[in-house]
Amino acid sequence: MRHQCRVPQLGRPADQRKAMLRALTTQLIREGRVTTTKARAKALRDEAERMITLAKDGSLASRRRALGYIYDKQLVHALFDKAPDRYSDRKGGYTRITRTVPRRGDNAEMAIIELV
C-alpha cells in the first residue's frame, strides 16, 4: 500500500514528469500565466514557488540551483533581479490558481495558474 504518497504522478514516468514540470515552470516564469489541467497546476505551484523563494534568497548557490532547473539562463537572471523587489513582503503564496471551463475533448478540469 502507498500510504501518504505526496508526489502527484500525473500519469507519467518520473523522468517525463520532471521534464514536464520544468517546462511548465519555465513557461510560467516567462509568461506570468499558464493554462493547464488542475492537477498539473497544483503540482506546478510547488515548483514555481520554490524557484521564487530561491530568487528571493539571491545567493550564488540558490542561483546555481535555479540554473539547473529552469531551462532559460536569461530568464533565471531576470527572475533573480526582479523577484526580491516584487515579492519582498510575501513569505509564500506567489501563485494563484483559477478554475476555468473543462477541456472540450475529454472534459478534464482546467485551470489558469498565474503569478501574483
Swiss-Prot record:
An MF annotation (GO) of this entry: structural constituent of ribosome
Pfam families, per the entry: Ribosomal_L17 (PF01196)
Cross-referenced SUPFAM superfamilies: Prokaryotic ribosomal protein L17
One Gene Ontology biological process: translation
Keyword Ribosomal protein: yes
Gene3D superfamilies on file: Ribosomal protein L17
Quaternary organization: Part of the 50S ribosomal subunit. Contacts protein L32.
Family label: Belongs to the bacterial ribosomal protein bL17 family.
Name recorded for this polypeptide: Large ribosomal subunit protein bL17
Lineage: Bacteria, Bacillati, Cyanobacteriota, Cyanophyceae, Synechococcales
Gene transcribed to yield this protein: rplQ
